[in-house]
């Protein structure tokens, strides 16, 4: 009986060795027989364009939704601001003057970072009304635009051409001359 167990053990070891050897021979051959995957260069599309301005949703004073893409076909001056921000307030007169001059040819999106605590729709709209500004103001109540543009400091202004590409960015308070030259560059395209 002991002899039979010994033969059985040897037989099991030989069978396991045969399975391992067979697997080592067959599996690499199967991998070699896999068809080669063909790849080709894909032409750059609008979606792959790194300069394409991220789309987002914001709301006007009446709660109507707007998207950046709604203004495709027209250059856009996109400005992120808040009423508690000193540099934001300091650049507003130049932005208003530019809006008065170019508002028929360039869309102005004055996006207020309305987080609901340090800035509310009420505080922002009260500031705008008190100063008599007439440019369009949009409220980023869900912070969607701020996230899309990775806004970590304000003010910041983006100059977006009619095809939706970001052509220039200015972080911090934008001087009137820089605002003017960037708008002129957008209109020249």
Report residues per predicted region.
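N-terminal targeting signals for export/organelle localization
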Residues: 1-53, 189
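Conserved helix-turn-beta segment immediately C-terminal to the redox Cys motif
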Residues: 74-75, 92-112, 129, 176, ...
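Thiol-based oxidoreductase modules, predominantly thioredoxin-like and allied folds used
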Residues: 106-119, 134-142
């Amino acid at each position: 009986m002991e002899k039979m167990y010994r033969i059985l053990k040897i037989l099991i070891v030989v069978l396991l060795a045969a399975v391992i050897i067979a697997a080592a021979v067959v599996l690499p051959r199967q991998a070699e027989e896999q068809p080669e995957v063909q790849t080709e260069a894909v032409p750059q599309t609008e979606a792959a364009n790194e300069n394409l301005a991220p789309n987002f949703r914001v709301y006007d004073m009446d709660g109507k939704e707007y998207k950046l893409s709604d203004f495709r076909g027209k250059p856009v001056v996109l400005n992120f601001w808040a009423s508690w921000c000193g540099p934001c307030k300091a650049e507003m007169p130049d932005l208003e003057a530019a809006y008065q001059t170019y508002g028929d040819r360039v869309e102005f999106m004055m996006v207020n970072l309305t987080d609901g605590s340090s800035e509310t729709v009420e505080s922002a709209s009260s500031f705008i009304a008190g100063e008599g500004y007439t440019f369009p103001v949009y409220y980023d109540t869900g912070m969607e635009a701020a996230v899309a543009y990775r806004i970590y400091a304000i003010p910041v202004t983006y100059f977006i051409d009619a095809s939706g590409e970001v052509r220039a960015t200015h972080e911090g308070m934008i001087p009137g001359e820089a605002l003017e030259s960037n708008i002129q560059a957008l209109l020249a395209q």
